[in-house]
Amino acid sequence: MESLSQHTPMMQQYWKLKREHPDQLMFYRMGDFYELFYEDAKKAAKLLDITLTARGQSAGKSIPMAGIPFHSVEGYLAKLVKLGESVAICEQIGDPATTKGPVERQVVRIITPGTVSDEALLDERRDNLLAAVVGDERLFGLAILDITSGRFNVQEIQGWENLLAELERLNPAELLYPDDWPAGLPLEKRRGAHRRAPWDFDFDSAYKSLCQQFATQDLKGFGCDGLGLAIGAAGCLLAYARETQRTALPHLRGLRHERLDDTVILDGASRRNLELDVNLSGGRDNTLQSVIDRCQTAMGSRLLGRWLNRPLRDRAVLEARQDTVACLLQDYRFESLQPQLKEIGDVERILARIGLRNARPRDLARLRDALAALPQLQTALSPLEAPHLQALAGNIRTYPELAELLRRAIIDNPPAVIRDGGVLKQGYDAELDELLSLSENAGQFLMDLEAREKARTGLPNLKVGYNRIHGYYIELPRVQAEQAPADYIRRQTLKGAERFITPELKAFEDKALSAKSRALAREKALYEELLEILIAQLAPLQETATALAELDVLANLAERALNLDFNRPRFVEEPCLRIRQGRHPVVEQVLDTPFVANDLELDDNTRMLIITGPNMGGKSTYMRQTALIVLLAHIGSFVPAQSCELSLVDRIFTRIGSSDDLAGGRSTFMVEMSETANILHNASERSLVLMDEVGRGTSTFDGLSLAWAAAEHLAGLRAWTLFATHYFELTVLAESQPVVANVHLSATEHNERIVFLHHVLPGPASQSYGLAVAQLAGVPGPVISRAREHLARLEATSLPHEAPLREAGKPQPPIQSDLFASLPHPLMEELARLKPDDLSPRQALELLYSWKTRL
């Protein structure tokens, strides 16, 4: 860039600020607009679809420029944040009236995808997370900060696979990692991932900074004193949050150590396949959360989303939640709680904005209404006997002083921002009331003064007025000017009149002319004082918000249990998974016909079900509903089944459906095999495994061999396994593996048309019905007829399904040539024909040299 001296004074100011924020788009306030210049302007014009223009010249070149009206900036910021961009907001802090040259400007806040807190820029029912990671390929420290709630979690994770799975679960808006990590890492593909200096992750400075933030001598009380890598990552997050927010962060009050051992682990593929909160098309319709989320508050919805994505293995916690849901179902108690919870609103994020000192007037109005609703909610909770409910009620305190303060201070429907005033009630502050009265009632004062002066002087043509140059005045016609009282001081002489000022009018002028600006300054100061009073109470208020969110989720689970006919599952020590009349919670909501419920029984003697049946027969639905029932049980919810008895699981794996990973250069079959490999390496006897059509992406015998070996391996692991397949050969596994049983989805044909019955019955399916399904899908009749001919021929010549089962683990000669095997080298054929005894030593040597040149 050219020397600053070559630029105009304003551009010099711009470049000094821009150099401090090279990675952010600079919104540079000029009057009623935020302007962007140079490359920022070009980028913003493209991203926001705004006009790119030019502004004069600086350093001999025209300046590319794009502008955004300041009053509509929120919409543009929201779009940029969604696109993963960061913005530095540069405001005018000097007074243009008293400044020579460019008005003083300063970057007052930095908006990044992971640190945004403005309500307009956030999805109210989704967490917005900032993450940092440090370590090596063996062990990583991961820290997660939700600046909109104050949640600050750390954990240490072994291996890339587990780290990437955890990042997929958390889906942070921004991810920070050390600048000295090599290029080409998997996490670089994530939107919002960017590098930070290695020293930002330094343990010693991080430890000191965190202790200072939490006002503690050490971090032992948070259970993370020994997590060196995680503490380094947390220190990086804290520094980044301070850098972007430009304020203290009083709502960050501690760390929480998360342990993978406490949770049911789901990898990224399982999370996608089960469509917990995002469907396979990337939307939110027809997901598990869309069905079971009727929370009354946004913070409740966010908590439910965290529960779904992080099921627990703590039986005591799960049963306490179940007891609470049962208590709320009794006499329909949840019905009286939910309307009260709706009045509470999103207290969690309001408190965070108060902590960040950027709470809007409407935030305080909502907090006022929430605090006013708490006493009635406390009364409703007091007779409820569930221990966990009582614990929650203990944290839902009432705040009569704060409630009264906000009631007195904030008008019923305040404006969106404090900038133009009009937020505080009349009577809250006497000085503000006087200033507002002066500002708003100047006209009436002047009318009253004019009437009094006419009466006092007896001059009927006297007028009181205002001039921007000379201020307030009393005007008399020139012929009456000599009759002016002694206290009239001449201010201005006109052609036909004289203007005067009096001590009373001068005193009023001094007050009135500055009253509006002074009133606004006073109101802003009082508003800041209100925020400070609330900040002093943040700790108990945040505990209350946390308890309210959980109460909302549990009341929601009670409502869903009643209206969706969910029943309480029972956890047992005996290894088992028994479901009576289980249903898919999402599919049953979208069907026009009644859902066909089915049983499932797995125990120590039966660990695997081989599931056969026609396409569209319901195999995948049956498998997914099992996983969703198990998952719902592990968040403390009731489940869509007549009854359910299960032992705790450690992981849920799914290998259901695949698509090409074009960006990663992986075929459908490669994706399928990668997911299968992950399951075979990590499943245990406490894992639930769903395997659907393993091996279908390659040749028949290769696919069958892989599916067979995978099923044998899982049977050996004794994992809870549902293995759906079209390879009927696998049904003979039940004869050699005592923990394997066969079931099938029933169907029948009528008048050459297939009827799916969707009942799960013991034993293998009798036939595939593939041609009937093809006919149902609209495949042309001649193609179906020709397919029947081919099928008859293939069934007559193929190996029978009853071929004897070879022993597992013993390699056998291939029964199908490998399409990718190399053809025999011609030299091998010559060598096979060669008779060594017929060669002389010289001939043998010449032949050897000849072969060597041909290799």
From Swiss-Prot:
<dbReference type="InterPro" id="IPR036678">
    <property type="entry name" value="MutS_con_dom_sf"/>
</dbReference>
<dbReference type="InterPro" id="IPR007861">
    <property type="entry name" value="DNA_mismatch_repair_MutS_clamp"/>
</dbReference>
<feature type="binding site">
    <location>
        <begin position="613"/>
        <end position="620"/>
    </location>
    <ligand>
        <name>ATP</name>
    </ligand>
</feature>
<dbReference type="Pfam" id="PF01624">
    <property type="entry name" value="MutS_I"/>
</dbReference>
<dbReference type="GO" id="GO:0030983">
    <property type="term" value="F:mismatched DNA binding"/>
</dbReference>
<comment type="similarity">
    <text>Belongs to the DNA mismatch repair MutS family.</text>
</comment>
<dbReference type="InterPro" id="IPR045076">
    <property type="entry name" value="MutS"/>
</dbReference>
<dbReference type="GO" id="GO:0006298">
    <property type="term" value="P:mismatch repair"/>
</dbReference>
<dbReference type="InterPro" id="IPR016151">
    <property type="entry name" value="DNA_mismatch_repair_MutS_N"/>
</dbReference>
<dbReference type="GO" id="GO:0003684">
    <property type="term" value="F:damaged DNA binding"/>
</dbReference>
<dbReference type="Pfam" id="PF05192">
    <property type="entry name" value="MutS_III"/>
</dbReference>
<dbReference type="InterPro" id="IPR007695">
    <property type="entry name" value="DNA_mismatch_repair_MutS-lik_N"/>
</dbReference>
<dbReference type="InterPro" id="IPR017261">
    <property type="entry name" value="DNA_mismatch_repair_MutS/MSH"/>
</dbReference>
<keyword id="KW-0238">DNA-binding</keyword>
<dbReference type="GO" id="GO:0005829">
    <property type="term" value="C:cytosol"/>
</dbReference>
<dbReference type="InterPro" id="IPR000432">
    <property type="entry name" value="DNA_mismatch_repair_MutS_C"/>
</dbReference>
<dbReference type="InterPro" id="IPR036187">
    <property type="entry name" value="DNA_mismatch_repair_MutS_sf"/>
</dbReference>
<protein>
    <recommendedName>
        <fullName>DNA mismatch repair protein MutS</fullName>
    </recommendedName>
</protein>
<dbReference type="Pfam" id="PF00488">
    <property type="entry name" value="MutS_V"/>
</dbReference>
<keyword id="KW-0234">DNA repair</keyword>
<comment type="function">
    <text>This protein is involved in the repair of mismatches in DNA. It is possible that it carries out the mismatch recognition step. This protein has a weak ATPase activity.</text>
</comment>
<dbReference type="InterPro" id="IPR027417">
    <property type="entry name" value="P-loop_NTPase"/>
</dbReference>
<dbReference type="GO" id="GO:0140664">
    <property type="term" value="F:ATP-dependent DNA damage sensor activity"/>
</dbReference>
<dbReference type="InterPro" id="IPR007696">
    <property type="entry name" value="DNA_mismatch_repair_MutS_core"/>
</dbReference>
<keyword id="KW-0547">Nucleotide-binding</keyword>
<keyword id="KW-0067">ATP-binding</keyword>
<dbReference type="Pfam" id="PF05188">
    <property type="entry name" value="MutS_II"/>
</dbReference>
<dbReference type="InterPro" id="IPR007860">
    <property type="entry name" value="DNA_mmatch_repair_MutS_con_dom"/>
</dbReference>
<dbReference type="Pfam" id="PF05190">
    <property type="entry name" value="MutS_IV"/>
</dbReference>
<keyword id="KW-0227">DNA damage</keyword>
<dbReference type="InterPro" id="IPR005748">
    <property type="entry name" value="DNA_mismatch_repair_MutS"/>
</dbReference>
<dbReference type="GO" id="GO:0005524">
    <property type="term" value="F:ATP binding"/>
</dbReference>
